[in-house]
C-alpha cells in the first residue's frame, strides 16, 4: 500500500521535471538565437538566392526551421519581401509560418504531451481535449493576432496540450495572414524604397495590433467568467446528498 502511495508523487515529480526541462531548453534556445544573433540571416538570404528558381521553396523550408528555432518572425518575413517582393513574398512567408507551427507543435507534442495529460489527470485531460476539439482552431487564430507573444513558443505550448496538426496549420495560415503581409511588404518596401508600400504595411500592422489587443481582452474576460462559473458550481451543495445525510 505504501509503495503504491509513494509511486504517485514520484511519477508526478517526474512529469513536472520533464516539463520544466523542456521549458528551460526552449528558453535557453530563445536566448541563444533571438538575443545573441547567433544565426546570420543575411548569410541565409545569400544562400537561398544562390538556389535560383528553387529559392522560394528553399526559403519556405529554411525559414520554417529557423522560425522553430526562435529566429524572429518579422525578420524572416522582411527577408522574404526583400528576396521575392511583396506578392510572392507573402505566400512564401505564409508557407514558412505554417511550417514553423507544424514543426514546433510536433516537437511540443512529442516532448510534453504525455506529461501534461498526466499532470491534468484523466478527467480534466479529457475535458481539455474536448475543448481543444471545439475551440483549438480559433485559439491558434486568436493567438496570432495578439501582439508580443512568440508564435514559436505558442506553437510548442499548443503541441504540448495536443492541438491537432490541421488546426495548427489552418489557424497559423488564417491568423498570420495580416502580419505576414505587413512584415513582408515592409521588407519589400525597404528593398524597393517604396513609401506607399511601407505606409500600407504599417497601417495593416497597426490595425492587426488593435484587433489583437481587443481579442486578448475579450478572451481574458471570458476566461475569468468561466473560472468564476466553475467556482460557483463547485460551491453548490448537492440537495440529495444533504437529505441523505439527515
From Swiss-Prot:
Transmembrane segments annotated in the record for this chain: 19-39, 57-77, 83-103, 157-177, 196-216
Gene Ontology CC: one annotated term: plasma membrane
Localization, UniProt: Cell membrane
Main location: membrane
Membrane topology per record: Multi-pass membrane protein
Stored InterPro entries: TMEM64, VTT_dom
PTM-bearing positions, type N-acetylserine: 2
Highest rank taxon of the organism: Bacteria
Alphabetized UniProt keyword annotations: Acetylation, Cell membrane, Membrane, Transmembrane, Transmembrane helix
Family, as annotated: Belongs to the TVP38/TMEM64 family.
Protein name per UniProt: TVP38/TMEM64 family membrane protein Rv0625c
Amino acid at each position: 500500500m505504501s509503495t503504491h502511495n509513494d509511486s504517485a508523487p514520484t511519477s508526478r515529480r517526474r512529469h513536472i521535471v520533464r516539463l520544466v526541462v523542456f521549458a528551460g531548453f526552449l528558453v535557453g534556445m530563445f536566448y541563444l538565437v533571438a538575443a545573441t544573433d547567433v544565426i546570420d540571416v543575411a548569410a541565409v538570404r545569400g544562400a537561398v538566392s544562390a538556389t535560383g528558381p528553387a529559392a522560394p521553396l528553399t526559403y519556405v523550408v529554411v525559414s520554417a526551421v529557423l522560425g522553430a528555432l526562435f529566429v524572429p518572425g518579422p525578420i524572416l518575413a522582411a527577408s522574404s519581401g526583400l528576396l521575392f517582393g511583396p506578392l510572392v513574398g507573402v505566400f512564401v512567408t505564409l508557407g514558412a509560418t505554417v511550417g514553423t507551427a507544424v514543426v514546433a507543435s510536433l516537437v511540443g507534442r512529442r516532448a510534453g504531451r504525455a506529461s501534461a495529460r498526466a499532470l491534468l489527470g484523466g478527467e480534466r485531460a479529457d475535458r481539455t481535449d474536448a475543448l481543444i476539439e471545439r475551440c483549438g482552431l480559433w485559439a491558434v487564430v486568436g493567438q496570432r493576432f495578439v501582439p508580443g507573444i512568440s508564435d514559436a513558443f505558442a506553437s510548442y505550448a499548443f503541441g504540448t496540450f495536443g492541438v491537432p496538426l490541421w488546426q495548427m496549420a489552418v489557424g497559423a495560415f488564417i491568423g498570420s495572414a495580416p502580419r505576414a503581409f505587413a512584415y513582408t511588404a515592409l521588407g519589400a518596401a525597404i528593398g524597393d524604397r517604396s513609401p506607399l508600400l511601407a505606409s500600407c504595411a504599417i497601417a495593416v500592422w497597426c490595425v492587426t495590433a488593435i484587433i489583437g489587443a481587443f481579442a486578448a481582452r475579450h478572451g481574458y474576460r471570458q476566461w475569468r467568467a468561466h473560472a468564476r462559473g466553475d467556482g460557483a458550481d463547485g460551491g453548490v451543495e448537492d440537495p440529495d446528498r444533504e437529505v441523505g445525510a439527515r
